[in-house]
Amino acid sequence: EESFGTWYSTLILFAAGQLCLIQSWLECKGAGRSTGSWLFFAVGFHILSIDEVVGLHEYVNTLAEDTSWTTYGAIIVLIIGLANLPFLARLPSRTRNLFVIAGAIYVGGALGVERATDWYDVNDLMNTLAYNLWTAVEEFMEMSGIVLFIFALLEHIVPVGQKPVRIEIQFRR
């Protein structure tokens, strides 16, 4: 998928991962309880960023021809979601609600719409207007979910009305 959309999705997934790393670092400095969870999500978003370019999830279809990768993806999302309920419960309600909405939008596109379009693939109808419209809906949902997540995370890192956090990166020889 060599397109602007793929490039943009890769960048925002990477940005989400970097922001989770920053939040993990801030939690560590402040003796927060969620350092590990933020680090887990940082790694996860970086993997999703790589997957967006490389298409690792599509490789799963070649390994398990009888089952769509979305089946395995749904199981993984369910496990991760359940395992992170305590983490979500510790977040402020606004952040938690925005994260859940963002996740639902992203997963709805990545797994829901993708699963719904499997029919087009099975019936060799991937070069149709209908399939391409569904693909646009899928990509829009994924991008919107990540942008909302980034918004919520930035708002969580620097709450409205508080002094901004200054992060400085220096490169030395």
Where are these regions (language model features)?
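Hydrophobic alpha-helical segments at protein termini of multi-pass membrane proteins
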Residues: 1-173
